[in-house]
């Protein structure tokens, strides 16, 4: 009985593990390493202190970042490149409320989930919050 319990727990452990490197594979978007700190006390980013607000940060990722406040002290950071388009003049997304809009195909992606009903969701990056500083990295 103990062997079966051990086997069941071990199986659940290995099934629950995932490699975040594999979950962000997208043939349209290269994988660049970066790390940026966003200071919420700066006027450009102060709107991120409020739920459901988003800002565009142009200097990281493939086409910049879209940073979104999900519930007060939790944030999502997505690449601003359209995830289902080759890189082109129209593939930088814009913020439209709680969605990101791809100008190429007019598809919208939810900034809470990154989903847009297409084969690839938004490319999501890691986020750490320490006080009024948001660190976003890949």
Language-model regions, residue ranges each:
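Extracellular/periplasmic metallocenter environments
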Residues: 104-119, 133
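Positively charged n-region of N-terminal signal peptides that target proteins for export
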Residues: 1-4
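Short cysteine clusters
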Residues: 82, 102-104
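Sec-dependent N-terminal signal peptides
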Residues: 7-8
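C-terminal motif of bacterial Sec signal peptides marking the signal peptidase cleavage site
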Residues: 13-16
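N-terminal pre-ligand scaffold of iron-sulfur
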Residues: 20-97, 110-111, 123-138
């Amino acid at each position: 009985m103990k062997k079966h319990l051990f086997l069941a727990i071990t199986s659940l452990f290995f099934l629950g593990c995932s490699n975040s490197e594999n979950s962000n594979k997208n043939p349209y978007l290269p994988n660049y390493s970066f790390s940026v700190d966003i200071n919420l006390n700066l006027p450009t980013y102060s709107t991120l202190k409020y739920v459901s607000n988003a800002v565009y940060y142009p200097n990281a990722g493939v086409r910049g970042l879209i940073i979104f406040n999900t519930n007060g002290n939790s944030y999502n950071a997505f690449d601003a490149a359209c995830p289902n388009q080759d890189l082109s003049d129209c593939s930088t997304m814009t913020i439209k409320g709680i969605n990101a809009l791809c100008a190429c195909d007019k598809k919208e992606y939810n900034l809470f989930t990154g989903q847009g009903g297409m084969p690839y969701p938004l490319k999501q990056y890691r986020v750490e919050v320490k006080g009024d500083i948001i660190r976003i990295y890949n």
